[in-house]
């Protein structure tokens, strides 16, 4: 549950600018359905409105639930479910406890409510009602992010005071990825170590029937600003992988690039799907040039093939003792930045996987750390040598060896960045 004392502190610290924005600023007029309508009606409505993420279920003008496109489509996709559910009431796939907020609720309070209610609300959206509880429309987590990014400078002191709470939120976002990772991999490690209590490095894993999708993400900055960016990326990535985009990491990067540039106003095109991006963009103050370096990987476990697309983040791998550590080199453009074109196309690279092959990803916090006698960067060569010398050992032991070498190399030098490092054996 959300700590009420944090909410009270936030209310006390609201600036005049923050007080101008309320939940109705995010209102999107979206057609609802009634409990009397069938799942066939919902399917038709979703097809007519491809941008709808969710549909409210309303009875006597009061919202009673929320149907999410992802869950609805996945439910009907199961064998015989169209025959079983098409003509039944749409409440069969309804979330009976969605977040419903008053149109006059402040953005500050709304942000805490959305984060406190978990990842589901950030991804699927929330219902906005009037003072009588009557349905007005929907708000999306994506639009909320746009407002919060604009208000971030004004709220920095408050966010810093809530840093411990932010750390809990960030770790909760990572939990499902750890669970899926342990389900699909037998010998692996994942080392996540923010420079501060929260950070801009993020990892993602999601299992599917035919394989799993893996991502290592290094967002702009560290600390609170970096952590805020990871929440944006986590929400976007969940949405992107709903369709068959998981089989096309380069395509997923392209979609992510467009979403980030639009959400943060790092675009020249003012077409923003009905949302007044210029009103909320930090670009108008010349402050926003944020994005991420990342590697997206789709592992087809049935075919034994890895498809990789990288934005300034390489993939390291080694097959046997007779070979050196090899790299799949990334494209040299990051995701979402002002100098990355809206239509930039990343490249997919395929790697056949053999039993026992070891694969590794790391953010630049490890590679770029200054240390040693010469006070130079740790570097890819030193990292590759460590991998080659130890790849036959269990992955958790490799993690300990690499990280101890990193700590020893850093010595008394200042820590430069967050570190996120993962490895797995196929």
Task: Give the residues covered by each predicted segment.
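… and, occasionally, acidic/histidine-rich disordered N-termini of signaling adaptors
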Residues: 155-354, 358, 413-426
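Sensory/regulatory domains in signal-transduction proteins
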Residues: 101-147, 151-154, 192-194
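The conserved cystathionine-beta-synthase
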Residues: 32-51, 58-59, 76, 100-123, ...
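A short, polar/charged loop-to-alpha-helix boundary motif
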Residues: 71-87, 142-157
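Bateman (tandem CBS) regulatory domains
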Residues: 17-31, 85-99
């Amino acid at each position: 549950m959300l700590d009420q004392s944090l909410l009270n502190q936030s209310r006390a610290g609201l600036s005049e600018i923050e007080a101008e924005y309320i939940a109705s600023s995010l209102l999107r007029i979206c057609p609802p359905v009634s409990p009397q309508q069938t799942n066939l009606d919902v399917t038709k409505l979703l097809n007519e409105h491809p941008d709808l993420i969710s549909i409210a279920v309303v009875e006597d003008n009061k919202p009673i639930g929320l149907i999410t496109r992802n869950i609805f489509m996945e439910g009907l996709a199961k064998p015989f479910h169209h025959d079983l559910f098409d003509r039944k009431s749409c409440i069969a796939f309804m979330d009976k406890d969605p977040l419903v907020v008053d149109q006059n609720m402040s953005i500050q309070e709304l942000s805490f409510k959305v984060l406190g209610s978990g990842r589901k609300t950030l991804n699927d959206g929330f219902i906005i009602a009037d003072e009588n509880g009557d349905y007005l429309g929907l708000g999306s987590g994506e639009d909320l992010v746009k407002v919060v990014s604009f208000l971030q400078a004004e709220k920095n002191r408050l966010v810093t005071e809530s840093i411990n709470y932010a750390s809990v939120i960030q770790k909760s976002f990572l939990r499902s990825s750890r669970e899926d990772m342990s389900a699909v991999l037998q010998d692996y490690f994942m080392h996540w170590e923010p420079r501060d209590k929260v950070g801009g490095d993020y990892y993602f894993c999601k299992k599917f029937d035919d394989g799993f999708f893996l991502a290592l993400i290094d967002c702009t900055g560290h600390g609170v600003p970096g952590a805020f960016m990871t929440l944006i990326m986590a929400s976007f990535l969940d949405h992107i992988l709903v369709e068959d985009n998981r089989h096309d990491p380069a395509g997923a990067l392209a979609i992510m690039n467009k979403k980030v540039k639009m959400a943060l106003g790092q675009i020249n095109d003012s077409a923003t799907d009905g949302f007044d991006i210029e009103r909320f963009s930090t670009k108008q103050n010349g402050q926003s040039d944020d994005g991420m370096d990342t590697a997206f990987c789709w592992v087809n476990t049935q075919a034994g093939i890895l498809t990789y697309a990288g934005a300034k983040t390489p993939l390291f791998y080694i097959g046997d003792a007779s070979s050196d550590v090899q790299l799949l080199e990334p494209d040299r453009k990051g995701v979402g930045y002002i100098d990355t074109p809206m239509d930039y196309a990343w490249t997919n690279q395929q790697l056949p996987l053999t039993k026992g092959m070891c694969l590794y990803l790391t953010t630049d916090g490890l590679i770029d750390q200054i240390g040693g006698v010469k006070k130079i960067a740790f570097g890819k060569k030193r990292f590759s040598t460590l991998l080659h010398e130890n790849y036959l050992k269990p992955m958790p032991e490799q993690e300990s060896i690499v990280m101890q070498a990193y700590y020893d190399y850093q010595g008394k030098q200042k820590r430069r960045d967050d570190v996120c490092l993962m490895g797995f054996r196929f």
